[in-house]
Structure formats: C-alpha cells, structure tokens
Amino acid sequence: MGLQLSGLDASDSDQRELIWAKRPWAAFRGSWVNRLGRVESVWDLKGVWADQAHSAVSESQAATSSTTTTATGDTLPEHPNALAYQISSTDKDSYKASTQGSGQTNSQNTSPYLHLIKPKKVTASDKLDDDLKNLLDPNEVRVKLRQSFGTDHSTQPQPQPLKTTTPVFGTNSGNLGSVLSGGGTTQDSSTTNQLSPVQRVSGWLVGQLPSTSDGNTSSTNNLAPNTNTGNEVVGVGDLSKRASIESSRLWIALKP
C-alpha cells in the first residue's frame, strides 16, 4: 500500500514485507496510546505471512480451474482485522451518567465498554489508503479520544473521574511483555509484577489516556466493576499504587 505503518521499521526486511503486503491488516493486533501520549500499534508478522500463503493457494487453484476468472488477493474473504483500519467513530451512547443529590456521578453502562471507539466500515475500497493514514495519525486518535471524553475543546486529553469509568489493563495478544504494554495480565505474570487481577474483560485492551499534560494527577482506587468474561486484568488504581506509576490513567478497550 506504499505506507510505512506505525510501529514498523522499513529498514528491517521482515517488516518491509509487512509494510508492502497486499493486506497488511492481517497482522494488525491493536493500537494504544502510551504514557507519553504517542499512538503505538501491535503487529504480528506471522499473521500477514499466513494471509499471503492463503492468497497464493487461492490464486493457484483458480489458475488450474476451468473458469477464466483471475484470482487475486482482492477475491479473498474480508479479513476481520480490516475493520481496524477504517476511520473510527466514537460510540457516545455506550456511556451515560446520572448525578445524585450528593453530587456524586454514577455510571449507567449500556455497553460492555465505556468510551468505546468503534470501527466505521467504508463502502469503497479505494478509500482504504486515506482512512488508514487518518487512523494511524496520532493527532486523529487523540481527537477521537477527546471527543469520547467530552474534552474536544482542549489541546490535551483530560481525565474524567475514575470512579465514573471502568479502567482495565491488559491485552489478549499474548505477545506483549512490559507492564505498560499489557504484561501482568496472566496469573503468573501478575504475581511476578506484584499485580493482582481484579476484574476480567473480553476483547482488545489497547491503551491509556494521559491524565494531564504534566502527568501529576493522582489516581483513585474507587473503580467501577466490570462483569465481562475474558482475560484477567488489573485495575488502574491498583496498578498505579503497586507499580509506582505516578499519573492516573484510563485504559481504553477496543473489541475487534
């Protein structure tokens, strides 16, 4: 597609193969915002290699068939990760809040995820290049996050009180090792990092939203419950206390 994708090194031969693959989204495993506010992506190179092998088999079978139709990668079924490359829209209806007489705000969940950034499918394949550029643009992602949290008037992502949200931490890709990238989501790694799983969630857990530009906002342990099933996760408040992470963070969950 002629694009150097986020998080990839064009000087590496294996990663060049992914960059120029017909369907690079087959290797896409999720995006997240790191503690510095930078958008990063997780790639599994084996995914695109398997996709290319499947494409080659399909083309070979079509070439030996009696039909005159020429098979290409475009004739393959749509890959489930293709939607992750479309420009996203914010599902504001998945989060509602009600204020009690005491002034405290309680969350009323109508979706498994709060502030969900969900894919919006495009109808024309020729729009994929532009939408991919937009999605991988850190400014575009930050704008979507600010819109999700009702702070689109600000130049920096701003926090909502953690007690009104459902902070979660982890990943289901199984190939991220550091704490900030999702390590510690299993029982063994949680014990190693002195982290105790407090909830479970399904789907992608893809990042954090910096609390303020200076990163000095304190976190809170008053976390809303999450009743989903899936990978073990660690609450943000618990993580901040035990891993000595100074600023409070809210992890955003995406479901492919």
UniProtKB/Swiss-Prot annotation:
Q: Which domain of life is it from?
A: Bacteria
Which intervals carry biased composition (Polar residues)? 96-112
Q: Which family does it belong to?
A: Belongs to the adhesin P1 family.
Q: Can you name this protein?
A: Putative adhesin P1-like protein MPN_132
Region Disordered: start-end pairs: 56-115, 149-235
The organism encoding this protein is Mycoplasma pneumoniae (strain ATCC 29342 / M129 / Subtype 1) (Mycoplasmoides pneumoniae)
Which Pfam families does the record associate with it?
Adhesin_P1_C
Give the compositionally biased regions (Low complexity).
56-72, 155-179, 211-222
